[in-house]
């Protein structure tokens, strides 16, 4: 029984390591937030995960997108700032941002439309990040992100 558990843990470790290695070149496309400018709004949330657009079970495992964490989202004219606990803050560029609602992703299912889904561009890749908001009106957040994207495109 112990050998079976050790084999399962080794398989999980090997799979996670392989996934992280397959996304290692994506890290060069991150824009890190320097924190010099003030955010227009801040929201506490739980960062759930990021997947490739259209592939909701394909977790993107690179840098601050690798693990679920308590986080803060901030609105800024240049984009949406994601500050996950224990990681450097990154900017999801306003150009190409699109927000909506979701019920499930990777390993999380909630009540209907209970997750915030943000589609954004990471270098040449289109990805979708999912968040569980804390004490925030989800509809207002979706509208604010979509307005930010429209302002940037205008």
Regions found by a protein language model. Name each.
Residues 3, 8, 32, 150-154:
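Intrinsically disordered, low-complexity linkers and terminal tails enriched in Pro/Gly
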Residues 65-106:
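Phosphoinositide-binding peripheral membrane targeting modules
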Residues 54-56, 82, 88-90, 122-129:
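Short, surface-exposed beta-strand/loop "edge" segments at domain boundaries and coil↔beta transitions
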Residues 18, 96-154:
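Acidic, Ser/Thr- and proline-rich intrinsically disordered linker/docking segments
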Residues 4, 39-40, 65-67, 74, ...:
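A generic structural signal for short, solvent-exposed coil/turn residues
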Residues 12-72:
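Anionic N-terminal interaction surfaces
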Residues 1-17:
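Alpha-helical transmembrane spans
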